[in-house]
């Protein structure tokens, strides 16, 4: 059995789990998330926690049980607390402004970049150079942050660009004659 799958997922107060065939639904204070469970993974709810097991003992099913456990744990954490990712804009004239479901970015191009936020994701701009992306789906929050970063990734010589708040940009020395 996968070592990850051996640990149960504790359900905090206010989080409700429902099974409908191979469909798992997790409902909490911040919203609802759904996941299709692989047929080789068995989930049992007991005493306020979820336990995961592989139906047969081969390597792929054990790995799938661990993966499912990690995904369900992220769903439980998302509907109870939510996820957030912080981005920083570094560079002269680089600005961000959130207007509803659109994020307006000035990243040194000849045109402004308008990024349409997907459903379930919100963006805040505490300052013109900081972007805070929030949502209940961990994968979607990370995907949106990566797409925004891809507009202008940090370059190694001056460090200008869009970076994650916890990212360390490797710097290069300029060529000398």
Curated annotation (Swiss-Prot):
Q: Output a single Gene Ontology CC term carried by this record.
A: cytosolic large ribosomal subunit
Q: Does the keyword Hydrolase apply?
A: no
Keyword Repeat on entry: no
Q: Which GO terms describe its molecular function?
A: rRNA binding; structural constituent of ribosome
- On the tree of life, the source organism's domain of life is Bacteria
Q: Which SUPFAM superfamilies match?
A: Ribosomal protein L6 (SSF56053)
For this chain's UniProt record, which GO biological process terms are given? Answer: cytoplasmic translation
Q: Which UniProt keywords apply?
A: Ribonucleoprotein, Ribosomal protein, RNA-binding, rRNA-binding
- Per its UniProt record, what InterPro entries does this chain match? Ribosomal_uL6-like (IPR000702), Ribosomal_uL6-like_a/b-dom_sf (IPR036789), Ribosomal_uL6_a/b-dom (IPR020040), Ribosomal_uL6_bac-type (IPR019906), Ribosomal_uL6_CS (IPR002358)
Task: Give TM regions.
Answer: none
Q: What does this protein do?
A: This protein binds to the 23S rRNA, and is important in its secondary structure. It is located near the subunit interface in the base of the L7/L12 stalk, and near the tRNA binding site of the peptidyltransferase center.
The record's family statement is: Belongs to the universal ribosomal protein uL6 family.
Q: How does it assemble?
A: Part of the 50S ribosomal subunit.
What is this protein identified as? Answer: Large ribosomal subunit protein uL6
